[in-house]
Amino acid sequence: MQTEHVILLNAQGVPTGTLEKYAAHTADTLLHLAFSSWLFNAKGQLLVTRRALSKKAWPGMWTNSVCGHPQLGESNEEAVIRRCRYELGVEITPPESIYPDFRYRATDPNGIVENEVCPVFAARTTSALQINDDEVMDYQWCDLAAVLRGIDATPWAFSPWMVMQATNREARKRLSAFTQLK
């Protein structure tokens, strides 16, 4: 995969430039655009992934299905599709917005900061996973209700962005709609 960049944003969320992705994530990470996606299978189960140990931020942490950064000229939805192909090897239904104004800042145990305007999406797949080991070290298809109970009981076991997204009432409601079989 070619070198990725992040789109830097000012406090109002207006793009101000770009920076190479790896260089952007430091103890002083500037505000930038990202996305987060929750992927469901034909049985209505959620894909929960464990970040590879080689990841700069939150290595080895359980999180929602796919996260990433849109590139210049790419929509958030196109970025979700691209990263699902790259990280999971799957085709997905068109991503649906479930938490469009999500924004957060969090510091991992190594001091790396995430500082993102991060719209949240959900999608479905019927494809078999072809996991990219550089991105994902483990995964589980899970009942959404069980994952939400786990987040409520042990939030420290999940990425902070997943916890914040899952504890938003409207996002939970929209995620629950994806557990219904179509």
From Swiss-Prot:
Subunit field text: Homodimer.
Record's catalysed reaction(s): isopentenyl diphosphate = dimethylallyl diphosphate
Native source species: Escherichia coli O6:K15:H31 (strain 536 / UPEC)
The protein's role, per its UniProt record: Catalyzes the 1,3-allylic rearrangement of the homoallylic substrate isopentenyl (IPP) to its highly electrophilic allylic isomer, dimethylallyl diphosphate (DMAPP).
Gene Ontology BP terms: dimethylallyl diphosphate biosynthetic process; isoprenoid biosynthetic process
Residues binding Mg(2+): E87
Name the record gives this protein: Isopentenyl-diphosphate Delta-isomerase
Keyword Translocase belongs to the record: no
